[in-house]
C-alpha cells in the first residue's frame, strides 16, 4: 500500500511530515483498525524522514561524513560509481531500522525525495511483520525480510471497497490460520526479535573513529532481574517478562479489530519515553499516555540519610528522615544520601541512545514558609 504523493502534500505543506495518511497500512486497517490506529501514533511509525529529529541527523551524516573509511572503501570498490557518495553509503547503516522502505527501494545511496511515500512511511506494518528470521542478537537490523509475501487468499490484490476485497477479507476471517502463520511467527513474542533494532553499534567504518555502543536495550534486559538472569538484583518479578509485556500491553479494541480477544489487543503504540515526537505534531493524547506509562511505579526514590557536618572531619548521620524530621540551621552544611531504585524498567534507566538520554532528580529544599532555599535538577 503506497500512497500517492498528492495525498501526502497537505500534511507536508502544513507541518513538514505526513501525519494523517497511514502509509503502508491501508490493507491491514480493513481488519486491524485498532492496531493500525495505535501504530499511527507510535514512534515506530515516525522513524524515518517523517521524524524531523532523525531527518536532521541523518541528512547531516549523508552530507558531511565524507571520509573514505575501510569498510566504505571496500563497498566503493564494488560500486565505483558511488565514489562521491560516501556519506550516503554510511547512512545505509541506519536505514535497516529507520528507513526500510527507502532502503529496500534502493534509494539510500541516491538523493532522497523527502516528500515521497517511501521517505514518509516510517516503519510500516510489513517492516516488522515481513521479517521471517533474526540471524542473531548482534542488532543493527540483522534480520531477514521476505522478498514478497504471497497472500494465499483469493482476490489478494483487489482494491479497497471492491467486491473482491470483501471476498478476500471474508476468506481470511473464515480461515485465518495461514495468515497468522505468515504474519505472527513464534519468535515475534521474544525479546530477541526486538534486539535486531534496539541494540545498536557504530563501527569505525561509519564514524571514522572507533567502534562504540550506541544503544543496547537487549543485553541490559537479558542481564536484569526482569529476565530472571541476575543473581545480585534487589528486584525479581514473580515471572520473567519480555519487551512485549511492558511495551505492548493489552489495550481495549473499540474499533472491532478482528484479532481482539475478549475485546483486547496487544498495543502497537510501543510506549516508551519519547514525548518530543507527539509534541511536534500536537498529539496530547499520546503525551498523556507516555506520562502515565512512566509514572506507573517504574522507579523508587528514597532520601535515605542526612549527613550533618559537626566539626571538621566529623559528621552525624541521621536516618529515617520521615520519622525524625530534623530541622536545619542557617549556614549548616549537610549532605543528603539519595537512593534511586529501578523497580519496573526492564533495562537500565534511562534507556535509549547512550549519548543523548539523561535522567534528572529534582531536589528542592523549602523553609518553614515554603520558600525555595535550594533546588537541584529542576527543569
Q: Would you name each region that the model predicts?
A:
Residues 28-31:
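Near-N-terminal "mature-domain entry" segment
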Residues 87-96:
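Hydrophobic alpha-helical transmembrane segments
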Residues 1-19, 35-82, 107-379:
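Primarily the internal scaffold of c-type cytochrome electron-transfer domains
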Amino acid at each position: 500500500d503506497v500512497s500517492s504523493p498528492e495525498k501526502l502534500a497537505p500534511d507536508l505543506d502544513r507541518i513538514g511530515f505526513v501525519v494523517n495518511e497511514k502509509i503502508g497500512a491501508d490493507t491491514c486497517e480493513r481488519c486491524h483498525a485498532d492496531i493500525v490506529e495505535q501504530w499511527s501514533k507510535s514512534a515506530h511509525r515516525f522513524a524515518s524522514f517523517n521524524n524531523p529529529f532523525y531527518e536532521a541527523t541523518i541528512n547531516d551524516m549523508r552530507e558531511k561524513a565524507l571520509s573514505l573509511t575501510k569498510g566504505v572503501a571496500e563497498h566503493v570498490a564494488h560500486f565505483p560509481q558511488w565514489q562521491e557518495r560516501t556519506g550516503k553509503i554510511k547512512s545505509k547503516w541506519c536505514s535497516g531500522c529507520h528507513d526500510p522502505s527507502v532502503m529496500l527501494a534502493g534509494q539510500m545511496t541516491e538523493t532522497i525525495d523527502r516528500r515521497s511515500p517511501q521517505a514518509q512511511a516510517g516503519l510500516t506494518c510489513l517492516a516488522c511483520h515481513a521479517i521471517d528470521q533474526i540471524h542473531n542478537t548482534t542488532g543493527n537490523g540483522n534480520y531477514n525480510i521476505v522478498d514478497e509475501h504471497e497472500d494465499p487468499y483469493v482476490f489478494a490484490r483487489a482494491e479497497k471497497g471492491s467486491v473482491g476485497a470483501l471476498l478476500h477479507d471474508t476468506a481470511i476471517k473464515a480461515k485465518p490460520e495461514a495468515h497468522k502463520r505468515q504474519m505472527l511467527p513464534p519468535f515475534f513474542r521474544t525479546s530477541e526479535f526486538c534486539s535486531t533494532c534496539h541494540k545498536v553499534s557504530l563501527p569505525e567504518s561509519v564514524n571514522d573513529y572507533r567502534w562504540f555502543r550506541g544503544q543496547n536495550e537487549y543485553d541490559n534486559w537479558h542481564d536484569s532481574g526482569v529476565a530472571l538472569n541476575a543473581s545480585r538484583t534487589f528486584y525479581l518479578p514473580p515471572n520473567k517478562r519480555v519487551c512485549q509485556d511492558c511495551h505492548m500491553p493489552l489495550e481495549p479494541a473499540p474499533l472491532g479489530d478482528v484479532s481482539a480477544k475478549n475485546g483486547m489487543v496487544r498495543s502497537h503504540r510501543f510506549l516508551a519515553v519519547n514525548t518530543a515526537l507527539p509534541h511536534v505534531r500536537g498529539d496530547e493524547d499520546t503525551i498523556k499516555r507516555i506520562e502515565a506509562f512512566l509514572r506507573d511505579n517504574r522507579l523508587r526514590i528514597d532520601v535515605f540519610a542526612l549527613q550533618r557536618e559537626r566539626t571538621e572531619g566529623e559528621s552525624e548521620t541521621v536516618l529515617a528522615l520521615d520519622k525524625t524530621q530534623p530541622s536545619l540551621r542557617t549556614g549548616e552544611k549537610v549532605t543528603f544520601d539519595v537512593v534511586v531504585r529501578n523497580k519496573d524498567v526492564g533495562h537500565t534507566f534511562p534507556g535509549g541512545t547512550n549519548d543523548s538520554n539523561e535522567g534528572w532528580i529534582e531536589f528542592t529544599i523549602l523553609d518553614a514558609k515554603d520558600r525555595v532555599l535550594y533546588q537541584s535538577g529542576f527543569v
